[in-house]
């Protein structure tokens, strides 16, 4: 907490070089510890005489996505960035057949500058549209859903949605799916509709694996019957122990595992590899994902 307020101590790279940030007026200044929590783009000075700076990280230029290494150079070939594998063409542009970088957001991410998100190299976003209360069982729309999906699509990002379930039977699962279908009507959803299945110390934790799997199937089948792609979000432990993952073979799997490389032995089409990402346009941490679905 103290570091978030430290506006006097200068940020430096691991080799002792001063790190800079660009202010809203376009001028560069030395970065302070507090900037780490508010700024998303950092620079190193390349020339003391000309005052040139180099950019490190993701950048979208003329509709193509690149990644600049610590020396300010475009990377090429196969690269592992923040634990996720990507493949870049010889000119540095991200290969269309490579995994695609994306994020997922909810009301907890606050107000988002979607144009800045798009320009940072993000290609898609999975937006929480709603959830069921873990104790009351009430169905609730995420208060940021409409502004998030409208802003993301206006910025040119592909979108999908997710719903946090606390359904305890198939009837409630269909009820949740019906709510989602109503919420996304009129929006161009190109990524799947995911059911978020995870621990919450609530009503959904008390059902067995067979019932939970039946809940997932009922939700996903209702979604697919309405013309959308459907999937399940869960971590490795839940996929292995609290769900019958092979019984969900008709639906996409979105794996959550915060490691350098996934150790889950089953099939998955999308991987959430960090909950502490830093993306321009979003204050604080954000979940990072890589999709292998090819769209």
Residue ranges of predicted features:
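Extracellular adhesion/carbohydrate-binding repeat motifs centered on closely spaced tryptophans
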Residues: 1-100
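Extracellular/periplasmic catalytic domains that process cell-envelope and extracellular macromolecules
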Residues: 36-37, 60, 95-97, 118-121, ...
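Functionally critical loop-and-helix segments that line ligand-binding/catalytic clefts
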Residues: 96-110, 246-295
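Substrate-binding cleft of extracellular glycoside hydrolase catalytic domains
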Residues: 99-120, 126-220, 224-226
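Hydrophobic anchor at the start of a short beta-strand
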Residues: 159, 229-231, 253
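Short beta-strand/turn micro-motifs composed of small residues
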Residues: 163, 234, 257
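Glycine-rich, charge-decorated loop segments at or immediately adjacent to ligand/cofactor-binding or catalytic sites
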Residues: 172, 238-246
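Aromatic-lined carbohydrate-recognition surfaces of secreted/lumenal glycan-active proteins
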Residues: 223, 227-240
């Amino acid at each position: 907490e103290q570091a978030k307020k430290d506006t006097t101590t200068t940020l430096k790279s691991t080799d002792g070089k001063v790190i800079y940030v660009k202010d809203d007026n376009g001028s560069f200044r030395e970065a302070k510890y507090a900037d780490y929590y508010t700024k998303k783009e950092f620079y190193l000075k390349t020339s003391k005489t000309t005052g040139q700076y180099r950019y490190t990280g993701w950048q979208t230029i003329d509709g193509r996505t690149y990644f600049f290494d610590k020396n300010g150079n475009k990377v090429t070939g196969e690269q592992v960035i923040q634990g996720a594998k990507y493949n870049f063409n010889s000119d540095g542009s991200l290969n269309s057949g490579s995994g695609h970088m994306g994020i997922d957001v909810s009301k907890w991410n606050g107000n988002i500058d979607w144009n800045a998100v798009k320009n940072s190299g993000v290609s898609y976003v999975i937006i929480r549209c709603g959830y069921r209360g873990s104790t009351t069982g009430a169905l609730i729309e995420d208060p940021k859903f409409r502004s998030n999906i409208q802003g993301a699509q206006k910025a040119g990002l592909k979108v999908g949605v997710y719903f946090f379930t606390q359904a305890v039977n198939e009837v409630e699962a269909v009820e949740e799916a019906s709510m989602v279908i109503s919420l996304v009507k009129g929006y161009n959803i190109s990524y799947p509709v995911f059911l978020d299945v995870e621990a919450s110390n609530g009503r959904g934790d008390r059902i067995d694996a067979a019932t939970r799997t039946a809940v997932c199937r009922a939700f996903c089948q209702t979604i697919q019957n309405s013309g959308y792609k459907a999937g399940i979000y869960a971590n490795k432990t839940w996929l292995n122990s609290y769900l019958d993952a092979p019984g969900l073979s008709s639906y996409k799997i979105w794996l959550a595992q915060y490691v350098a490389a996934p150790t889950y032995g089953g099939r998955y089409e999308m991987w959430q590899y960090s909950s502490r990402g830093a993306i321009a346009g979003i204050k604080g941490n954000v979940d990072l994902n890589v999709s292998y679905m090819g769209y």
